[in-house]
Amino acid sequence: MPPGSGRGGRRRAESLVREVLGLAGLRPSDRLGQHFLIDDRAVGEFLKPLEKAAAEGIREALEIGPGAGSITLPAAEVLDRIVAVELDNRLASALSRLAPARVAVITGDGVSHAAASQAPLVFSNTPFNLSPAIVEALAVNNRVAAAVLGVQYEVARRMTARPGSRDYSRLSVLVSLVFHAELAGVVRPQAYYPRPQVLTAVVTLRRRRRWRSLYARALELAGCAFTQRNKKASKVLRRCLEAAGCAPPPWLDSLGDARVWMLRPEDFVGLAEACRG
């Protein structure tokens, strides 16, 4: 029975976590932000979009931070090839002993692998402190067509926020420039061992636009502007442009009384183009 459809809620995932932690001889590390998924229904929140991707022909994936393999092993039942990158070499060694041949477990830094991966699909129950860095690495890597990410709920709100909303931020601009983002599910703290103190959200990303080098400057300007998100955009952007050594474009004053949080991602791209000359 697939993990997402088990009536007992936990069962397979919890048993797997116990087995892998036992093989590795370790306890969860606060320093590494380790929280292991032990609820089968929660695993199903990740599996559903992975199954959809597989049905569309996307069958090779990179997993960042497989941990004890709660998502890895059931995902291997629907995908042809998974490279799972784990920072903790003890976990990587233990998981590799249980993983099928189609799963290659390696030790390494997930952000670096996200930026360089050849796989069209990436999935991760992300360490919360690395979520924004992972998203940015995926955005820059045009080979990545889709991603399924578990992130802190507040981060998910920023990833899916639209201009004019309270959660709209530099991260929102980054995601919107290249991805279509959807909130696919919510996982409660009790689905993890040990329990985190926050909700986790599952976010799906689908690439809608290739990354351009111009976007780096657009995000630099957005990062500067959102430090004063409630101020008049024209004044804030003028200071940000001058700090970047760029002349403000003539249309800047046409923003009127608009605030920074009202600007569209395309506005920042337009500023970057003006800055380029």
Swiss-Prot record:
An annotated GO cellular component: cytoplasm
Residues the entry annotates as binding S-adenosyl-L-methionine: 35, 37, 65, 86, 109, 125
Source organism, top-level taxon: Archaea
InterPro entries, sorted: KsgA/Erm, rRNA_Ade_methylase_Trfase_N, rRNA_adenine_dimethylase, SAM-dependent_MTases_sf
S-S bridge residues: none
Keyword rRNA processing included in the entry's annotation: yes
Transmembrane regions: none
SMART domains: rADc
Family of this protein: Belongs to the class I-like SAM-binding methyltransferase superfamily. rRNA adenine N(6)-methyltransferase family. RsmA subfamily.
GO molecular function, one term: rRNA (adenine-N6,N6-)-dimethyltransferase activity
Cytoplasm recorded as keyword: yes
Role, per record: Specifically dimethylates two adjacent adenosines in the loop of a conserved hairpin near the 3'-end of 16S rRNA in the 30S particle. May play a critical role in biogenesis of 30S subunits.
Cited NCBIfam families: ksgA (TIGR00755)
EC nos: 2.1.1.-
Compartments, as annotated in UniProt: Cytoplasm
Protein name in the entry: Probable ribosomal RNA small subunit methyltransferase A
Keywords: Cytoplasm, Methyltransferase, RNA-binding, rRNA processing, S-adenosyl-L-methionine, Transferase
One Pfam family of this chain: RrnaAD
